[in-house]
UniProtKB/Swiss-Prot annotation:
Gene3D superfamilies in UniProt: 6.10.250.1950, Ncd80 complex, Ncd80 subunit
Any GO BP: mitotic spindle organization
GO molecular-function terms, A-Z: kinetochore adaptor activity; microtubule binding
Residue ranges the record marks as coiled coil: 249-394, 479-638
Complex formation: Component of the NDC80 complex, which is composed of ndc80, cdca1, spbc24 and spbc25. The NDC80 complex interacts with mis12 and zwint. Interacts with cep57r.
Record's protein name: Kinetochore protein NDC80 homolog
Protein family (similarity comment): Belongs to the NDC80/HEC1 family.
Amino acid sequence: MRRSSVTNRQSLLPLRVQDANRMGLTTPQNKDRQGFGKLSMSKPHSGTSEKKTSFFGKRASNGTARTSQYGAFGGTEKIKDPRPLHDKAFIQQCIRQLCEFLNENGYSQALTVKSLQGPSTKDFLKIFAFIYTFICPNYENPESKFEEEIPRIFKELGYPFALSKSSMYTVGAPHTWPQIVAALVWLIDCVKLCCVLRSENPVFEDPPMGEQSENGIDFNQLFLDYTVRCYDQFMEGRDTFEEYDTDVCIRLKEAYHVDESNLEALQQESRRLMEEIERLEKEKENEPDRLASMRKLKASLQADIQKYQNYLTEIESHSTLLDQRVSSISEELEATELESRAIQQENLRLKNILDNQKYSVADIERIKYEETELQQTIAKLTKDLDEDKQQLWHEELKYAKMKESVETQLSEFHKIGRKVRLIPPTAEFANGYDFQIQCNLDSEQSSLMHYRNKINVPLVEILSQSEGHIASSTNKKMGVEDMVEQLNTLIGEKKNEVKVQKDEAQKLEEIYQQKVEESEEHEKRWISEIESLEKHRQLLESGVNKSLDEAMKDLQKEQQELQLVEHRTEEEMRQVENKLVRVVHAVANHVAVIEKHLEEKRLKVEREYEEFMKEDLLLDLRELLEKYKEKARVLDSL
């Protein structure tokens, strides 16, 4: 006996007294029965919520609600599929699970989610065989009647929903692929569950009899004693065994050292885990494609990082330019300081001379006047210097704006050149010329006029070539349009012919219907005559018994004539039908011949068009000109 079936088990024998509150011998059917591989996520029930009855009586809930691993066993009614097979998000999730399983387990081909949107029947057979080999390693795809073999395998595995034979022929169709991919995901769940069961220790296996395994013989002896005592009480007429249930529970708890104080903590832990699972499921429902959103966020962040790196590079280059300017300005400042020191020394020397020297009042006045003039000159020069600096600042701003606009125009020029395939030199229309403008606007050697002269000549050459190509293409297009117009005219004529043939067929159909109506009228007339003759026969039988033989003979004659007339009518109808069938076949053949002729004309025109496109147009014109010249010579000679 298995240990998992000891604590709460239904009675193996029927009750003597029928009790509506007790369970019968039928297998209980769970309405929420899930398929194999779907784990039950129902909330755990308290082990003490129901009163225990017989050890084999009502089963007290002591854990999660058990679901069938092999589908529903009771009844053959068709179960409605609760899965949202019409939901695109659900189907895409199933396809991703299938793709991940195949790639992780070494499938022979590298698959993507896009390649699994609508696979062929051959690919489906390979995928099914690869997955099913995890359950049955010796399985091989059947050479024939796979449409019967695969649904049978799913049915044997306990797949709760039916797969039709027709769905095996159109696996990749939009109306059948959701059912197939859901079945494959169910099969993957089966494989995962089998792998888990194989990897686990055989905890629930029956201990071998006769060996001193841990609690093995005690357990078997305990169960056998309980069974014997319950059976004895059952044979005596009892249906409930509460005292034996209580006794065996106590002995089992002692045997397995069950601590009831930990049950509440375990139940709280179980409830916490269930709440955590529900929270994670809600998060998954709210964010079904969180990985894709995180990848997009990662890509945007990487793009921002790249932008910031480019910005830092530009800042570093700008900082380098500023350092160069600072160094040049510092050198100028040092030179200015040296010049200022020299001027100060000169002023000291002159002041010393002035102190040692005696001046007259006129000299002092003259010196003051010269000093005033020099101060005015210095103020004027200082003002001019400030104005020059302000002008230089404005010129630098204009230069920066002009440089920025030139760089924008250069980038736009390069962008347009790549778009029209002129850049790089190896592009389609570059003809080996380098149209890229790579110049440093800060350097004095750069000259846009040099690049303008370098690029202008090849551009003019390419422009002239393009105009020639455009003119030749325009001429070709006009010729093709004329040819298409001729073809449309020919097709219109053929359509008119087909319309005439259809009108003739309709007329023949009307004639046939008229003949059928005439035959029906003849038949009705003969039926009415037969009815009148039958009435006449009845009158003769009731009125005159003597002329019965003569009336019978007359009736036979009339019947023979009727048969002859019916035979003639059938022959006429058969002839009319044969004629009509021949006419319809002739019309259909004629229509088929016309369609074939039109198809040949179309193919011929396409071939001529291809040959026409391959041929040199000027060669045909030259030949035509020569022919006209020859005809003109002949006419002149005449």
